[in-house]
Amino acid sequence: MDARTWRLGWRCLLLLALLGSTRSEGVESCEEVRKLFQWRLGGAVKGLPEAPRAGPDLQVCLSKNPTCCTRKMEERYQIAARQDLQQVLQTSSSTLKLLISRNAAAFQETLETLIRQAENYTSILFCNTYRNMALEAAASIQEFFTDVGLYLFGADVNPEEFVNRFFDSLFPLVYNHLINPGVTDSSLQYSECIRMARQDVSPFGNIPKRVMGQMGRSLLPGRTFLQALNLGIEVINTTDHIHFSKECSRALLKMQYCPHCQSLMLSKPCMGYCLNVIRGCLAHMTELNPHWHAYIRSLEELSDAMHGTYDVEHVLLNFHLLVNDAVLQAHLNGQKLLDQVNTICGHPVRTPTQSPRCTFDPSKEKHGMKISARNGEETLANRRKEFINSLRLHGSFYGGLADQLCVNELAAPEGRPCWNGEEIVKSYAQRVVGNGIKAQSANPEVRVRGTDPVVNQIIDKLKHVIQLLRGRSPKPNKWELLQPGSGGGMLENSSGDCDDEDGCGGSGSGEVKRTLKITNWMPDSMNFSDVKQVHRADHGSTLDTTSTGCASGTESMALPLMGTLMFLPWLW
């Protein structure tokens, strides 16, 4: 035999030994075990066996053969086995966790942008149409949309209260500038009396009630949707760091590290053996599966139902139209309101005043928000649909987790020599049990006892959020779905369930039916107490915020003209 043939044969034998395809009989040194122990666990090699020996003190890695392990090594290996399983759990859930967390952040950012645009539209309405009261209305507009954001993102604020507060603060401005224009009372007490009288004299008709209904129907589902996404992240974070029982830890040690004691460092467990161990360890987690599936289904149902007056995007971007209707209604009933206010609050001290008007500061033009033209309409509803379609792929995540870990990470391929808990064999001979707690009564590798309080708590939270999600989903025959009409406005659904209070009809000045385009831009800086200006552009539009208000030029604009300019197709 020449030297080349001898070297090749030696390398083959060495490779077979490293692959764990040979028994540990005849192993004379524990040097490789010592090195791997030090590298993997960072432990000192002092005191570790240099050669295989009897291990009478071992509790899990029992063998009739000499061993390279000690009791202390066994304890360290058991900790490492638990950490290894947690690591593969976190790796397996990382895609799902990233999907939910990124979309939760994107939805929140998009809602923040929607609120800013809706505030801009409302400010534009006053600046272009009711210029005399624009600066005075700015604080109330800002406060209203701040409350909208607080509510959407989970704060304890009441939509009915902030809607009433907005219209209460609007009435004195409308009274002083439209109903009794050119004169005002220097006393704050008189303005406060007008504000307090708003709900009694109803200057805006049923519009505040319509706004309350629309805000309630749209903001609450949006708020619940965001809260549900955050709970989904919490569920994954909790299961990523689940506590494993003592029986599970011993089984993991036996499966993952007991081969090391026989110098079989690169061996992998048999598929059936791995399934029994991991299904036993994750038995309680598997019980999450039906609730997780129902959670995703409930998210989908709520998302599908968020249309028309249930769609926060539609409601926010059309809020200014209802405000315009409210101001017009008060103006049309001016004489009646004048008499009612005089009866309740008395006659004002007639002091001619000049209200501050909108002006445009060109130096602030750089703070404008540019909306670029895009090939498609990427709306919040479309983004929700894409997210739900991706999330649906993970509907059985917890039910198939054990199988996924064994197939993709832990077990040897079928037909290959593998570790069965005692030695290297061609196949696993024990019965393979199914998933779930009930199936584990016959598990030969892991004894599963009782219930897991942490998993039970997660299940309770999922049940609760499922009830919330389903409670926020309107029944199909109650949806106020808005469909594009041939005249450029919106048509009510044919069910007859949608009335004026539902807000299905527009004001006639151009309802915003196609909504926010989700873009990558964000304004450099914005001051939302400012009054806003809109400029036309050939291939897009620019919403500019200025420190003092709107464009100079015509002192007032007719409502139809303002609506036409604001809602031309190029704005979208």
UniProtKB/Swiss-Prot annotation:
Listed Pfam families: Glypican
Keywords recorded for this protein, A-Z: Cell membrane, Glycoprotein, GPI-anchor, Heparan sulfate, Lipoprotein, Membrane, Proteoglycan, Secreted, Signal
SS bond list: none
Any one Gene Ontology cellular component term annotated for this protein: side of membrane
Recorded topology in the membrane: Lipid-anchor; GPI-anchor
Any GO BP: regulation of signal transduction
Glycosylation sites: 120, 237, 486, 493, 495, 507, 509, 527
Compartments reported by the entry: Cell membrane
Signal peptide: 1-24
Keyword Zinc-finger assigned: no
Described function: Cell surface proteoglycan that bears heparan sulfate.
Family: Belongs to the glypican family.
Stated name of the protein: Glypican-5
Organism, scientific name: Mus musculus (Mouse)
Origin organism lineage: Eukaryota, Metazoa, Chordata, Craniata, Vertebrata
Gene name per UniProt: Gpc5
